[in-house]
Amino acid sequence: MDKIIIRGGKRLSGAVPVSGAKNSALTLLPCALLTDEPVTLRNLPRLADIDGFQHLMNQFGVSTSIAGARPEDFGRVMTLQATRLTSTVAPYDLVRKMRASILVLGPMLARAGEATVSLPGGCAIGNRPIDLHLKALEALGAQIELAAGYVRAIAPDGGLPGGRYSFPVVSVGATENALMAAVLAKGKSTLHNAAREPEIVDLCNLLVAMGAQIEGIGTSDLTIHGVDRLHGATYMVMPDRIEAGSYACAAAITGGEVMLNGARIEDMEATVQALRDAGVHVEPRKGGIYVAADGPLKPVTISTAPYPGFATDMQAQLMAMLCLAHGSSVLTETIFENRYMHVPELNRMGARIETKGRTAVVHGVEKLTGAEVMATDLRASMSLVIAGLAAEGETQVHRLYHLDRGYERLEEKLSLLGAEIERVGGD
């Protein structure tokens, strides 16, 4: 099994391209199920999860073609066409590796009148139930059945009538599934307390480009007027705000300066504020975001929250950066339980982090030291890389399949910035 070896202590400097957003791409891909015309997505990141979702779409009879497949390219262009659906079942062997597979439920139901999806796996971060997905689809008129590890959704004869649903808690995935189901419903649908993440806006913008009628984009109250059919579209995937924030933390912990080409500061204001509070200089520049750290890092107190709050997907990376802050930082995780699995690994590198329930206290230390560490999930694995970049000596990060799910060609990008990092085959 591959591992990454980092020889730390190098100051990061230079420019790095920010890839298309993984969390957006995995929502845009299933939109191809909503039309028999071609949907072309540009700036699609090269990631294991994207490849897995492509295989899932092929399972339904969706044709896919890829341009920009040269080894030196960042990003790709994929065209998907669901001329005729040959299956409405997402089987266990494809779904188990990737939670995002549940996002085919809404669009498949809207297009075909039924959908059967294996209950998802693919994530070790606490309990991520899909009950809100199912309740939202029921509110739009679907009949839901659960049996033998599968969920089956069935629309009434004539299609989904549409309806009204108020999310008891904000759910990004459930908002996405409900949106994709509602755009082809026979009537009007309203979604209250909907998620407002930039990735939701990206989804809405693609659906509108395909002919959907959606009001309230970017707010927590969405109104969808169902249409008879959607057409194809060509769309550019938004830049990955989590990847951009991760590289910003890497620049900061090494006392470096980095230009994040393609990043949009308006998508990541909470992350930018946290970095500024920690003493990092962040400013928008033409074509991206400039990040520089030329002084000591300061401790911060922060809680994760739904957008526009601080993203849970940035918690581990910020924590790694704060290991070298001058003072004690307090991080509270309000979105997912069990999202501190990186803490023991960071402590192996000399960090001083204490956890109690959903709160972690990070006592800044003078230095980190290289060690062999093991990734436990996607963002935790990036936190170990960030720590390794600043650590004295050599750090080896194992279980790279987590990183490959969410960071396009990580070692190449960090090498562009001067990091001494390589991927090698494991024992």
UniProtKB/Swiss-Prot annotation:
Its EC number is 2.5.1.7. CDD domains: UdpNAET. It is found in: Cytoplasm. One of its GO terms (biological process) is UDP-N-acetylgalactosamine biosynthetic process. UDP-N-acetyl-alpha-D-glucosamine binds at R99, R128, P129, I130, D131, L132, D313, I335. It catalyses: phosphoenolpyruvate + UDP-N-acetyl-alpha-D-glucosamine = UDP-N-acetyl-3-O-(1-carboxyvinyl)-alpha-D-glucosamine + phosphate. Coiled coil: none annotated. The active site is at C123 (proton donor). Phosphoenolpyruvate binds at K22, N23. Keywords: Cell cycle, Cell division, Cell shape, Cell wall biogenesis/degradation, Cytoplasm, Peptidoglycan synthesis, Pyruvate, Transferase. It holds the Pfam family EPSP_synthase. Gene3D superfamilies: Enolpyruvate transferase domain. GO terms for cellular component: cytoplasm. One of its GO terms (molecular function) is UDP-N-acetylglucosamine 1-carboxyvinyltransferase activity. The modification 2-(S-cysteinyl)pyruvic acid O-phosphothioketal is found at C123. InterPro entries: Enolpyruvate_Tfrase_dom (IPR001986), Enolpyruvate_Tfrase_sf (IPR036968), MurA_subfamily (IPR050068), RNA3'P_cycl/enolpyr_Trfase_a/b (IPR013792), UDP_GlcNAc_COvinyl_MurA (IPR005750). Pathway: Cell wall biogenesis; peptidoglycan biosynthesis. Belongs to the EPSP synthase family. MurA subfamily. PANTHER family: UDP-N-ACETYLGLUCOSAMINE 1-CARBOXYVINYLTRANSFERASE. Cell wall formation. Adds enolpyruvyl to UDP-N-acetylglucosamine. This is UDP-N-acetylglucosamine 1-carboxyvinyltransferase. The lineage of its organism: Bacteria, Pseudomonadati, Pseudomonadota, Alphaproteobacteria, Sphingomonadales. The gene is murA.
